[in-house]
């Protein structure tokens, strides 16, 4: 099972960016922890980070009819502004879980609305870097349930 992990703008500078909000973890450390967790669950991860909205949309569109069983995404500030990324999530054809390091509901008012979260299967927010662990557990559970249902349908049709 292959899961796509998409990281949005400014996440490439985690560890340096406002550590009082986002902690001291770097993106590489988060990815290494996710990779270890995925290995324990017989899953493969592909990581993608971009500061550009269109590149994130292009990557989500690769999920259509593709090899991914699900997406874990931290759209960062784009979650509050990008209807285009929300549309790409809604039409990518696989379950998506949104994750935020900080609690977006406890910050500035404009951060409390998530266009992308509204079209995701779930949203994990405010657990720091551990939120990625929770999000991966969630997307693996959903993807496994979908795979089991598809197998059951195939057995009934055989």
Swiss-Prot record:
Catalytic site: 22 (proton acceptor), 100 (proton donor)
Organism: Helicobacter hepaticus (strain ATCC 51449 / 3B1)
Gene Ontology biological-process entries: amino acid biosynthetic process; aromatic amino acid family biosynthetic process; chorismate biosynthetic process; quinate catabolic process
Family annotation (InterPro entries): DHquinase_II (IPR001874), DHquinase_II_CS (IPR018509), DHquinase_II_sf (IPR036441)
Pathway note: Metabolic intermediate biosynthesis; chorismate biosynthesis; chorismate from D-erythrose 4-phosphate and phosphoenolpyruvate: step 3/7
Keyword Translocase tagged: no
Annotated site, Transition state stabilizer, chain positions: 17
PANTHER family, alphabetized: CATABOLIC 3-DEHYDROQUINASE
MF terms in GO: 3-dehydroquinate dehydratase activity
Family membership noted in the UniProt record: Belongs to the type-II 3-dehydroquinase family.
Function: Catalyzes a trans-dehydration via an enolate intermediate.
Domain of life: Bacteria
EC number: 4.2.1.10
Name of the gene: aroQ
Descriptive protein name: 3-dehydroquinate dehydratase
Keyword annotations: Amino-acid biosynthesis, Aromatic amino acid biosynthesis, Lyase
Residues annotated for substrate binding in this entry: 74, 80, 87, 101-102, 111
Known catalytic reactions: 3-dehydroquinate = 3-dehydroshikimate + H2O
Subunit organization: Homododecamer.
Pfam family name, one: DHquinase_II
């Amino acid at each position: 099972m292959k899961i796509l992990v998409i990281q949005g703008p400014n996440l490439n500078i985690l560890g340096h960016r406002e550590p009082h909000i986002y902690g001291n973890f770097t993106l590489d450390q988060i990815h290494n922890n996710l990779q270890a967790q995925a290995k324990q669950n017989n899953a493969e991860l592909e990581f993608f980070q971009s500061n550009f909205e269109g590149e994130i949309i292009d990557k989500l569109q690769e999920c259509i009819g593709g090899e991914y069983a699900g997406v874990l995404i931290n759209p960062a500030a784009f979650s509050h502004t990008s209807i285009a990324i929300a549309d790409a999530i809604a039409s990518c054809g696989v379950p998506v879980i949104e994750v935020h390091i900080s609690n977006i509901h406890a910050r500035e008012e404009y951060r409390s609305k998530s266009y992308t979260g509204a079209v995701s299967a779930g949203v994990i927010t405010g657990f720091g870097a551990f939120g990625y662990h929770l999000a991966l557990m969630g997307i693996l559970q959903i993807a496994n349930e979908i795979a089991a249902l598809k197998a059951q349908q195939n057995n009934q049709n055989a």
